[in-house]
A protein has these predicted regions:
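Canonical Rossmann dinucleotide-binding motif of NAD(H)/NADP(H)-dependent dehydrogenases/reductases
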Residues: 1-26
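Active-site-adjacent segment of SDR/Rossmann-fold oxidoreductases
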Residues: 19, 166-177, 223-225
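Conserved mid-core segment of classical short-chain dehydrogenase/reductases
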Residues: 37-39, 68, 76, 90-105, ...
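Active-site loop of short-chain dehydrogenase/reductase
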Residues: 51-53, 80-81, 113, 126-140, ...
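Amphipathic alpha-helical dimer-interface segment in Rossmann-like NAD(P)H-dependent oxidoreductases
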Residues: 72, 76, 93, 101, ...
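Catalytic Tyr-X3-Lys loop
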Residues: 82, 90, 97-117, 135, ...
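Catalytic loop of short-chain dehydrogenase/reductase
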Residues: 127-128, 132-174, 183-188, 198
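C-terminal helical subdomain
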Residues: 181-182, 200-280
């Protein structure tokens, strides 16, 4: 997995670790960030404590040789690759005139190119796996202007991830490799979102990382040959798997969860009985 030293990526890793999973964490954070918690080494410690085996790897997903070497090392240590989780991303929710080109390039190199590269490096190993999955942390592929008109640089990078899902699902369907995307209905309470978007107060109107971890777990356990090319929303995935208690994922039940993420189309409404309004 890429970008798993904290937040959603780490939560997904810990969920899998409780089943004894072997997890390679490919991320840049070898030393503590001045604003954000966690490194690949602290993440590895948490994974091992949860019951998994961890391989922390310092990787810049913009660097081809580092990505290929990391995938090869993971395959050699664990005997193959069953799942590729493209979680690494860069975010800047700015308009066109406010986005400098350095930030634009960073988002597209990490989010878009990094997803393509990491998937490409994993595919030869995934072809040999029993139930191979690639999961991209991207929104549904919807290019209507109402979505693109907000934060064009960031949104377009995330939509390239979605295009990788759609295109590779078709390209590698015959190989039995599943390519799917997963996206949250609401804001998710992570240190990165607190720092870059909402602040501490804004986190109270979010769901916890557990909802994304639980949804990813459901996807990974589906038959790869039957479930591919899907754009999944966290609460829909869980509802369809039988979950009915979504209030447990709220950071603060007394706060509304907002109107939902701007990149989720109207064709993917809330599951029956699920509300974003405060519950008490």
């Amino acid at each position: 997995m890429t970008g798993g030293s904290r937040g959603i990526g780490l939560a997904i890793a810990l969920k899998a670790a409780r089943d004894g999973a072997n997890i390679a964490i490919a991320a840049k954070t070898a030393e503590k960030h001045r604003h954000l918690p966690g490194t690949i080494y602290t993440a590895a410690e948490e994974i091992e404590k949860a019951g998994g085996r961890a391989l922390p790897l310092v990787v810049d997903v913009r660097n081809d040789s580092m990505v290929y070497e990391a995938v090869d090392r993971a395959a050699q240590k664990f005997g193959g690759v069953d799942i590729c989780l493209n979680n690494a991303s860069a975010i800047s929710l700015t308009g066109t005139l406010e986005t400098d080109m350095k930030k634009f390039d960073l988002m597209h190199q990490i989010t878009a190119r990094g997803t393509f590269l990491t998937s490409k490096a994993c595919i030869p190993y995934l072809k040999k796996a029993a139930n191979p999955h690639v999961l991209n942390m991207s929104p549904p592929l919807d290019v209507r202007t109402k979505y693109l008109g907000r934060h064009v640089a960031y949104t377009s990078a995330k939509l390239v991830m979605a295009m990788c899902t759609a295109g590779m699902a078709e390209e590698f369907r015959k190989d039995g490799i599943a390519f799917n995307s997963l996206w949250p209905r609401t804001g998710i309470a992570t240190a990165a979102i607190e720092f870059a978007v909402s602040g501490k107060e804004g986190l109270k109107s979010c769901r916890t990382v557990d909802i994304m971890a639980d949804a990813a777990y459901v996807i990974f356990n589906k038959n790869a040959r039957e479930f591919t090319g899907n754009f999944c929303i966290d609460d829909i995935v869980l509802y369809e798997s039988g979950e009915r208690d979504f209030d447990k994922y709220r950071v603060d039940p007394t706060r509304d969860l907002g109107s939902g993420d701007y990149m989720i189309p109207e064709t993917m409404p809330l599951p029956p009985g699920v509300s974003l309004k405060a519950v008490r």
